[in-house]
Amino acid sequence: MKKMNLVTAALPYVNNIPHLGNLVQVLSADAFARYSKMSGIETLYVCGTDEYGTATETKALIENTTPLELCNKYYEIHKSIYKWFNIEFDIFGRTTNKNHQDIVQNFFLQLEKNGYIKERETEQFYCNKDSMFLADRYVIGECPECQSMAKGDQCDNCSKLLNPTDLINPKCIICKNKPILKKTNHLYLDLPKIKTKLEKWIKNPDTSKNWNTNALKMTKAFLRDGLKERAITRDLKWGIPVPKKGFENKVFYVWFDAPIGYISITKNIIKNWESWWKNNDQVNLVQFIGKDNILFHTIIFPCIEIGSEENWTILNQLSSSEYLNYENLKFSKSEGTGIFGNDAITTGIPSDIWRFYIYYNRPEKSDFQFMWQDLMERVNTELIDNFSNLVNRVLTFQRKFFGDVIETIEIQNKFWKQITPKYNKILNLFKKTELKSALKEILKISSLGNKIFQDNEPWKRKNNSPQETKELISNLIYLIRDLSILMMPFIPETSKKIQQFFGNSYQFSTKILGTKSGIKKIEFTEILFNKLEQKKINNLKLKYSGDKNMKENEQAENLPIAKEQPENLFREKVLLRVVKINKIERNPEAKNLFILKLDDGTNKDKQIVSGLEGYYTEEELLGKHIIIVDNLKPAKFRGIKSEGMLIAAEDKNKNFKVIIVEDSIQNPIAGERIILENDQNKDLACPPKIDINKFLKANIVAENGELKINGINLILENSKNKILSKDIPNGTVC
């Protein structure tokens, strides 16, 4: 059993001020690290700023400064914001530290030595005026999708992922002249060559069992569709130099060097860094990331470590979260919309309130919209009327009627039988990084404490049954002490204040939960929080809503907040069709990839690429009807275009089977759409192109041999026959 917890949060990019959504990862890792330390586990929480790459170089140009000066500026801004939010890093460093270059270059040399690096000639935009190759963010132009101005990697308006060559009327961001395409050489990490070792690691029972569902589904879908070689070099100046002849003027792509930053940042601060990073048998690596970073942490970084063929500590526990958004608007400093870290400091709202609200709504399984009205309601009802109220009413009652001294108490077994079983449940939720659920379970205990106080009516019984009333209040005081321990990972300043009421040195250990000794006296009390007022919230909402006037804000405030249910997402975003496999070919570049030639009812050949080697032979699939995600954005796998993705079911024992629509039972028609059972006879729109993450959010499951979403059957649109999963009766669909 592993004895040490190495905790990391995704390294924030250091060319901007972090907003509330950016803070989710560092706050999540902070809560887990605090829990781990309270549990007596040796713990190291590592984070730092990701400083190299195109975004930094271009931002430095805009601010008329050097990349390093820009990083120095924003590093201090990040540090001050994290300090105000009371994020307790053990190490908070930078990827521009003195060890980073050596470690990154050493990883590269090991990968090259072991045969995992390839060289390839490509075409890239080149600016004749500035005499330089242009990385993606150095190119701007018109988005082909929405015609807005966009950078060469992604359109900020419609979120479409782009290559610089996709842009209409591309221009150099520096001189605004039109670039030309020019050949250049780059180095690639040969992910397909590492794939077998990677899959063996992922299939190990001790690996992915500790990953959350979305991360695991996305990783498996990515693997199934085949890994591609990935460029690791760029034509930039700001970055780690490539230690290879002929590549002296190139640097490593930031995605290659950034995850290695966890290691270099640790080495830069502590001497025994190898006891953490080269100790896979003893160290549990727990990583907190956003959904946009999943593949970098489940595929790219592990491949770098595995390919080096050294005993690196590798990912064991992964907690990925969805997006925290703002009032149906985008976080934008320039437009004045959204709360950024420095804004939170000036609102006059304490950091523990911000922490509480972010944890309470941590986007663990779906995106969450920050709403000012919801902030006020959740804080006033759950944090103040529930938790803070229990602390105040119990301690005030004790001091008013029984004095400051806490007498030795008689244990009320009936009281504690309601409470103590819940402690283990909460600690287990912490262990599994289900932080939102842990917080809500703690609040349930607080609510139960209020109910016990109310039901026993101590204000009535204190005269007729003074001893019993004393015992009740004393037991409630120890409950408050326990709640201060459990709430410590979420609201540390408030938890410390509660323990100061008892005059003790801080006792933040899970080992004393449920014990009934150690509190002698109440030294002082005070109100923990003041309620948030509607007027203040209205003013803050207006202030951080950009150019919208108060009327628009009030209208938005009255709109119902509709959570995107999986069945609604499926109906509006996902297009499943039945297709018939007419022909199967092998990719000459990757024998594990099947190229499936499909009949989709349009009399045009359609093809998808899927990694089915080891699962099926060609004979088992040829002529079968299967289901594909028909509106998935096209992709290339080892040079072969794939126009969709087949769907399959997987059970808890990792058994994997393609969903096959039986001719004799279900009477499928090639091209027939798959719909929800309650959408029969409806005129359904054809949804837009989506990425794989959007499909996975539909949460299709196999349940008792039938495919369902939220309990609703999927059926064939024409025959109305249910979609079956005979081989995997119960499992997830990916």
UniProtKB/Swiss-Prot annotation:
NCBIfam families: metG, metG_C_term, PRK00133.1. GO terms for cellular component: aminoacyl-tRNA synthetase multienzyme complex; cytosol. The lineage of its organism: Bacteria, Pseudomonadati, Spirochaetota, Spirochaetia, Spirochaetales. Its EC number is 6.1.1.10. ATP binds at residue 333. It is found in: Cytoplasm. It catalyses: tRNA(Met) + L-methionine + ATP = L-methionyl-tRNA(Met) + AMP + diphosphate. Its main location: cytoplasm. Belongs to the class-I aminoacyl-tRNA synthetase family. MetG type 1 subfamily. Homodimer. GO terms for molecular function: ATP binding; metal ion binding; methionine-tRNA ligase activity; tRNA binding. This is Methionine--tRNA ligase.
